[in-house]
Curated annotation (Swiss-Prot):
CDD domains: GATase1_AraC_ArgR_like. Disruption phenotype: Mutant is unable to grow on choline, GB and DMG as sole carbon or nitrogen sources. Mutants that lack this gene are unable to induce plcH and pchP in media containing GB or choline and in phosphatidylcholine-rich environments, such as lung surfactant or mouse lung lavage fluid. The gene is gbdR. It comes from Pseudomonas aeruginosa (strain ATCC 15692 / DSM 22644 / CIP 104116 / JCM 14847 / LMG 12228 / 1C / PRS 101 / PAO1). Residues 244-265, 292-315 bind DNA. It comes from the Bacteria. Specific regulator of choline metabolism, which activates transcription of at least 25 genes from 11 promoters in response to choline metabolites. Required for the induction of plcH, encoding the phospholipase C, and pchP, encoding the phosphorylcholine phosphatase, in response to glycine betaine (GB) and dimethylglycine (DMG). Also controls the expression of gbcAB and dgcAB, which are required for GB and DMG degradation, respectively, in response to both GB and DMG. This is HTH-type transcriptional regulator GbdR. GO terms for biological process: glycine betaine catabolic process; positive regulation of amino acid metabolic process; positive regulation of catabolic process; positive regulation of DNA-templated transcription; regulation of DNA-templated transcription. Keywords: Activator, DNA-binding, Transcription, Transcription regulation.
Length: 367
């Protein structure tokens, strides 16, 4: 998306051309959330305000994270001229970004293109060195890994970040908020509000909104003291706060602290704190090349053997095997296929499930 010269009447502006670079296993919902506001902007204005193209390195089909295939409009070597490029990431982002992607993005930056990303696409821009010194948003599952891998990038938990000629968004439907914000900047709030109404979108969220489900919903309670304690725990994983200190911070006794966790979370505060640290460790093991010793240290464990013991007890697999791919730790359990369905084409759901096994949230909800 370009920055228009002031004073140019809207009817005299050329359509903005946007290239969506699709990485392997990109999330379809993030792509749709970015493209659909552009389509609706054209429809409601009755003019071609935006045009868009999907791109891949070689112009061949790209698999989305749900197993569906998208045939792009062009490859990067014969891509039409665009004003900006938006990288669409998804599952297994470290494996999806290649040297060729980096070279292409760096070339776009040298040519003065604006660059954006949705879901985990920020990883590609960061790997190309194109986010150094910029504010950046990325899907929360990838946040810890990016903080470790790219210390020069100002990572944020915001839904989206717009910083000079870079705009990055977290996943899910957050790209829609970012695109509506950009459309509103360029064509007025009346248009962005009308687009929002067409999509039954109750509220256009802004840059001050943060991702992750609010603690009160995650914890299943409105207990404010408990929310405050958990927020403190999440913010202090590398150097865990003593439980007595936690109680002092929120002005409760140690005994009250214990009762709150038992009543609402059905575990002790120390057990819950340990769970948070182990979940962070799993993200780093799966998404970074940090050694097990380093992971243990940044997650608040002074002893690597103790870390390995706790990890195995919680996840059922030692950290070493998790790093190697854990096919034996948490296999995908398949239901028997009925005989009358055996000859039908394979569902793309199984392929998508297989690809997702490498994600840190795989099998994280116990049912």
């Amino acid at each position: 998306m370009t920055t228009y010269a002031p004073g140019v009447p809207p009817q005299n502006r050329n359509p903005q051309s946007i290239g969506f670079l699709l990485l392997d296993n990109f999330t379809l919902i993030s792509l749709a959330s970015a493209v659909e506001p552009l389509r609706m902007a054209n429809q409601l204005s009755g003019r071609e305000l935006y045009r868009w193209h999907t791109l891949s390195l070689d112009g061949r089909q790209v698999w989305a994270s749900d197993g569906l295939q998208i045939t792009p409009d062009a490859g990067t070597d014969n891509a039409p001229a665009v004003d900006c490029v938006i990288v669409c990431g998804g599952v297994g982002i470290q494996r999806s970004v290649t040297r060729e992607h980096v070279t292409f993005l760096q070339a776009q930056a040298r040519q003065g293109r604006r660059l954006g990303a949705v879901c985990t696409g920020s990883w590609a821009l960061a790997r190309a060195g194109l986010l150094d010194g910029y504010d950046c948003s990325v899907h929360w599952e990838c946040l810890a890994a990016m903080q470790e891998a790219f210390p020069r990038v100002a990572m944020s938990t915001r839904l989206f970040s717009i910083d000079r000629n870079r705009f990055t968004s977290s996943g899910g439907t957050a790209p829609m908020d970012m695109m509506l914000h950009l459309i509103g900047r360029e064509h007025g709030r009346e248009l962005s509000a009308a687009i929002s109404e067409m999509f039954i979108y109750e509220r256009i969220r802004n840059e001050q909104d943060h991702q992750r489900v609010p603690l009160k919903h995650m914890l299943g309670t409105n207990q404010p003291k408990l929310q405050e304690i958990v927020a403190l725990m999440e913010a202090n994983l590398e150097e865990p706060i003593d439980l007595d200190e936690l109680a002092v911070y929120v002005n409760v006794s140690r005994r009250q602290l214990e009762r709150l966790f038992q009543k609402y979370l059905h575990c002790s505060p120390s057990r819950y704190y340990l769970k948070l640290r182990l979940i962070r460790a799993r993200q780093l093991l799966k998404q970074t090349s940090m050694s097990i010793i380093e992971v243990a240290s940044v997650c608040g464990f002074v002893s690597t053997p103790h870390f390995s013991k706790c990890y195995r007890e919680y996840f059922g697999i030692p950290p070493r095997d998790e790093r190697q791919g854990q096919p034996l730790g948490q296999p995908v359990v398949l239901m028997p296929i009925p005989q009358d369905l055996a000859l039908m084409p394979n569902s793309s759901a199984l392929s998508a499930l297989s690809q997702a096994q490498g994600e840190s949230t795989f099998a994280s909800v116990r049912i």
